[in-house]
């Protein structure tokens, strides 16, 4: 359907200019219509990208390691950018990026969200001054629910109040940067999540040093990874490489200790060594003998049961990555040792029998990457010593012409393989275990204003997963197309077909569709209308959503207002709607049942851009029920209303 739609409109698209690609467009394409279990640590990954979007990189001065944080950019593309700057001088406009070999259409669309181009005169005239200037930001956020959950009204229940509080700040001076964060979740009695980091960056042999909280990723993330993205975008998103400070609010997926990146240039390529050492306490559910049954990742400590799991097991991780790069070839090896001060005993349930057991775990991997102009190949093979399991992942990307990209991702993850710090693309979540599969990917922009992207994926899971008592298969096909007939209008459509065994050993087929129209008569105003549908087991869930964005000419004031009507049979037929959120957070709502959702966000920024104030109010009205949620999270009533406020000071 999308292909016919694209071909019918092809002759109308020539010479037209696409609407600006916004942060909301990016998040929508990355998050909506994806299962929670398929998303893995996607929200934390999007949250880190939100911080990068709010503090874009100067493309003319950013180090290669920094540019590799930008989604869609490959190592080859980063090298081409630096080569272009070396030969032709600083990049002056975004349009100049089209002249750089290796920059695809997808990169050209996403890059403006995460980079900035500073005028060359300012770069030369203020170079020394900028380095010596102290810069930073501090923000405080609070969320206030205008309702009570059952946990606040019964005893025993939640110990604290229902408010959410968060502090976060960063300081930067010359080559040093430091940051801190603290958070209190609803239901907790006090701030119980703290963290910070100190990072030093140099251009000599010691490229980067991070003390405190950090994240790390090497190769394809099979041993240790810091973010993965599956689905329509998995082939254009490169896995995060190296070390970087922990800037988000996640309470589980990070390391705490010290790490460094050392690089030496030789006559036969560049050598890099990245050692790391981490020790921290993790939340865990213990059995009667004091063994670890489950590692908890939500960071919630509201009830006595949850507080009993708080920091109950110590986790040590030590290792590093050794890499070598020469022209078009990169080779590397990763080794890591993990140890817990309590043994892991996940239980005898069938799906838990492949979970890691014991207290000592060792891993080793080899990774590679090579680029031949329009062909890029990369991959990793990993081995876990305690159970003798293998895992392999490869990515092949071919760009025969600038406006066409083809991809292939074969993978094999033995059910005997495991790594508690891994993060790699899988059909379910981001844990590379118990899966083999292959994905085909296609992305093209035949003419300006028309683009088409599709992928097909098949995976096999030999060991029973949670809720399934047999081996299982999953097949997925997804396609999306975008058409911009003029600078003011844009049409977008997505269809997904999914077939496989689900919980309860039931074979199901899902059809999901999303149609979207955007109208932007001028830069300060935009209107977006979306129609969503989800069909499974001969029942249909659907929703209609609209969003209006407006801002003043001086950009001091901005507002976003949205409304959604949803009508689904049950949770199986749920729909997803992205909702603009406060600075430094991501809001991707899941709706089931029958109801209406409305939200509004207003932002004010001072003329000198030092002060920022954001306020958001969201309300959901359930038509089909007077009781929402279950257990201690139950809400007695049809309404669910929240108010969030954020204040930021930058200097």
Where are these regions (language model features)?
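C-terminal extensions
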Residues: 17-69, 107-166
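Boundary at the C-terminal end of the N-terminal hydrophobic targeting segment
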Residues: 13-15
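Small-residue hinge/turn detector
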Residues: 74-78, 104-105
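Outer membrane beta-barrel
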Residues: 187-283, 403-420, 558-571
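Transmembrane beta-strand segments of Gram-negative outer membrane beta-barrel proteins
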Residues: 126-153, 171-180, 209, 218, ...
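Outer-membrane beta-barrel proteins
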Residues: 181-194, 245-251, 308-311, 382-384, ...
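Bacterial N-terminal signal peptides
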Residues: 1-8
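Exposed, low-structure sequence patches enriched in small/polar residues
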Residues: 153, 158-162, 268, 313-348, ...
